[in-house]
């Protein structure tokens, strides 16, 4: 972390105890300027919340059998959505509520949605559409307001389809 005011770097390393980063392999970052919070997605360490003002960490991990936790401790991307975070993981996507630390796993009930497992990237366009890059499954678009999920895949018979189903970001 770089403190612009003091012009100093602060290094965070995994240490025993709850007040450190959970893993040093970082895959995703999102800075919430309104709350001065850095959300850190790690590879095998789940999601970390760093409160810049206090320097305190909070960890969010997958708990087997608990659908209100992360679908995986391998976090690939983080995107803000209203007062929540869309978390892309190695085992699907969830809508994370920072207020209570709970996840709502998305797309578990639809045939198309069950294809969304190894998610490489998520982003929103200017119309509020969520775009999902799912390794091996192409690209998905999702509208929260309508619940419409669309899968775009490579089709050798269609020269206008995407070029490959392995989309990383």
Where are these regions (language model features)?
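Carboxylate-rich, polar loop motifs that coordinate divalent cations or form catalytic acidic clusters
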Residues: 1-169
């Amino acid at each position: 972390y770089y403190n612009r005011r003091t012009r100093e770097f602060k290094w965070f390393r995994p240490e025993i105890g709850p007040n450190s980063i959970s893993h040093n392999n970082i895959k995703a970052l999102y800075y919430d300027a309104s709350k001065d919070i850095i959300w850190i997605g790690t590879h095998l360490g789940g999601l970390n919340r760093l409160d810049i003002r206090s320097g305190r960490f909070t960890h969010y991990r997958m708990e087997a059998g608990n659908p209100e936790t992360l679908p995986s401790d391998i976090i690939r991307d983080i995107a803000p959505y209203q007062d929540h975070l869309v978390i892309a993981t190695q085992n699907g996507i969830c809508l994370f509520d920072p207020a209570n630390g709970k996840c709502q796993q998305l797309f578990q009930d639809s045939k198309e949605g069950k294809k969304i497992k190894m998610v490489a990237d998520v982003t929103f366009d200017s119309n509020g559409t969520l775009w999902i890059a799912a390794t091996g499954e192409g690209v998905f678009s999702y509208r929260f307001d309508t619940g419409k999920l669309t899968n775009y895949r490579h089709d050798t018979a269609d020269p206008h389809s995407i070029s490959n189903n392995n989309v990383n970001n």
